[in-house]
């Protein structure tokens, strides 16, 4: 009761077409509700009248009132203000144009729904624009399920930093905290919100942005994602009609990103690649006039007659610094393992219906031998440098080459402690038989044929039986011994899997929290107890220290 008495309630009147903007600090949590019958929206999701809507710390957002309205806020944050400058009318116009395309597609007058790419510099509000457009589509009551494509690994819509994802939300997406801006994937506990179980497929880049070094890996990942979305549209007519929204990284604004050596004058190559892969028909540019002009002049854009639309950057978009981004990344990884955090008692105990945020997950920590968990890196190599090769020689390695990590090496080389690993499914056909093992099998086969030939020449049944048994025994023994040696060498030096597994859809994520060099074991944090679904993992550059 004492905690309830410290909760301060403040009423705020909003003019028609105005926004109430707020920025929560590390020690600020609020809950709000609308006291008027007229609708109030947060990222185009309508607030339920008189129901408390909790918002967790570090969140920066805004409420929009198309008509005059009154809201009530608990524990008014230090940074908040009301503004009549808003981009909601522009977003609504975009939505109406896309809704028309969906309806025409449903009637058979268009092949598919809108496919929209959203571009802009850092802190321009790309994810927020995408969230608004998705919520506007979901709020029509037409049963749309638009695809939300997350190509910004520094601001993942559903999972953790370093990941790319495809999700298909079917209900308006709430705004409660930094994690899961476009809905959370299914978990082992009951969902906290109606959009808590969003179907999500993920791929692992293992970095916060695409670069010229990982451009080839990026291209393959995007192609796999586009293929997965195409298969979904073939099976689900509604998904094809609903269309998709594609969030892009800020690095896409760099003209030379992904430019190849054989075509140094090419510009926006990764942008063009994504346009072709997902068959984009509309590009939305936020606030960047030069980018808008450059994209309009791209040969691919002109040949496909794409719509390139520029909208202003919202005045409520907050310029985030490195500390803000690091805070968001830590929160996102922690939420993946521990679930959504609980709100303080003075907010969760408010009288009135509200969305609960008190279902935490229970991650599982255990040890696993080095020999059982195969940790790989994509696009890296530990061979001798070019300077150590013979004069005139050069290294020719696949950009998708897999390299096995040796945990017994120096820490600055291994780089596994506190690293996030992506688990990938490995099938029997993904296994590569080492060269030595193949040679041993051939020797066994030849030996067996020779023995059979000698036995047939003898023509004696008793000797034939003895000879055959002896030959098989020797062959099997020799093969087993050689195979063991080959596997031992393979475990330490070669990667016994095809390169394709490095860019495959991932099954989940784990974190290596400790490395025991004496016992030769990892200590691993997994979101669920029990055995891992696979023992092959891909490492990247994403770190997270479990401070729980």
From Swiss-Prot:
Required for endonucleolytic cleavage during polyadenylation-dependent pre-mRNA 3'-end formation. This is mRNA cleavage and polyadenylation factor CLP1. The keyword 4Fe-4S does not apply. One of its GO terms (cellular component) is mRNA cleavage factor complex. The gene is CLP1. ATP binds at residues 19, 60, 123-128. Residues 482-494 have a biased composition (Acidic residues). GO terms for biological process: mRNA 3'-end processing; tRNA splicing, via endonucleolytic cleavage and ligation. GO terms for molecular function: ATP binding; ATP hydrolysis activity; polynucleotide 5'-hydroxyl-kinase activity. It is found in: Nucleus. Residues 437-500 are annotated as: Disordered. SUPFAM superfamilies: P-loop containing nucleoside triphosphate hydrolases. Belongs to the Clp1 family. Clp1 subfamily. HAMAP family: Clp1. It holds the Pfam family CLP1_N. Its main location: nucleus.
């Amino acid at each position: 009761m004492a905690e309830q008495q410290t909760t301060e309630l403040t009423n705020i009147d909003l003019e028609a077409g105005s926004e109430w903007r707020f920025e929560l600090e590390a020690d600020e949590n609020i809950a709000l509700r609308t006291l008027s019958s007229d609708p109030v929206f947060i990222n185009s999701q309508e607030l339920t009248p008189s129901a408390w809507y909790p918002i967790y710390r570090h969140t920066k957002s805004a409420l929009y009132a198309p008509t005059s309205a009154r809201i009530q806020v608990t524990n008014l944050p230090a940074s908040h203000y009301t503004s009549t400058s808003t981009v909601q009318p522009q977003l609504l116009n975009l939505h109406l144009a896309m809704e028309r395309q969906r309806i025409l597609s449903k009637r058979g007058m268009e092949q598919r729904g809108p496919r929209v790419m959203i571009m802009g510099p850092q802190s321009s509000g790309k994810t927020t624009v995408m969230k608004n457009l998705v919520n506007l589509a979901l709020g029509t009551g037409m049963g749309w399920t638009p695809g939300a494509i997350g190509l910004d690994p520094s601001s993942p819509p559903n999972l953790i930093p370093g990941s790319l994802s495809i999700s298909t939300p079917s209900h308006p997406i709430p705004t409660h905290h930094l994690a899961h801006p476009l809905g959370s994937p299914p978990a082992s506990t009951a969902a906290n919100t109606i959009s808590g179980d969003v179907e999500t497929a993920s791929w692992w880049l293992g970095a916060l942005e695409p670069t010229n070094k990982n451009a080839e890996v990026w291209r393959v990942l995007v192609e796999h994602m586009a293929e997965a979305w195409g298969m979904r549209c073939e099976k689900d007519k509604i998904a094809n009609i609903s269309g998709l929204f594609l969030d892009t990284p800020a690095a896409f604004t760099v003209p030379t990103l992904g430019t190849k050596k054989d075509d140094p004058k090419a510009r926006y190559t990764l942008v063009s690649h994504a346009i072709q892969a997902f068959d984009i028909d509309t590009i939305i540019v936020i606030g960047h006039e030069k980018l808008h002009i450059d994209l309009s002049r791209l040969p691919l854009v002109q040949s496909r007659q794409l719509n390139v639309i520029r909208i202003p950057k919202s005045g409520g978009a907050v310029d985030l610094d490195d500390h803000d981004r690091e805070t968001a990344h830590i929160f996102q990884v922690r939420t993946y393992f521990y679930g959504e955090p609980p709100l303080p008692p003075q907010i969760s105990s408010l009288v009135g219906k509200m969305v609960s945020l008190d279902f935490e997950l229970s991650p599982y920590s255990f040890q696993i031998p080095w020999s059982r968990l195969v940790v790989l890196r994509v696009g890296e190599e530990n061979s001798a440098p070019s300077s150590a090769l013979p004069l005139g020689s050069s290294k020719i390695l696949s950009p998708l080459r897999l390299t096995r990590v040796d945990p017994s090496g120096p820490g600055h080389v291994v780089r596994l402690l506190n690293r996030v690993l992506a688990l990938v499914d490995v099938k029997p056909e993904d296994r590569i038989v080492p060269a030595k093992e193949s040679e041993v099998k051939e020797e066994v086969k030849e030996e067996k044929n020779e023995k059979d030939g000698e036995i047939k020449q003898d023509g004696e049944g008793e000797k034939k039986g003895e000879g055959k048994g002896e030959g098989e025994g020797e062959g099997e023994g020799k093969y087993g011994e050689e195979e063991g040696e080959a596997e031992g060498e393979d475990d330490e030096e070669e990667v016994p899997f095809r390169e394709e597994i490095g860019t495959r859809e991932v099954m989940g994520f784990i974190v290596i929290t400790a490395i025991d060099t004496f016992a030769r074991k990892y200590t691993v944090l997994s979101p669920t107890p029990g055995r891992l679904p696979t023992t092959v993992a891909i490492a990247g550059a994403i770190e997270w220290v479990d401070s729980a």
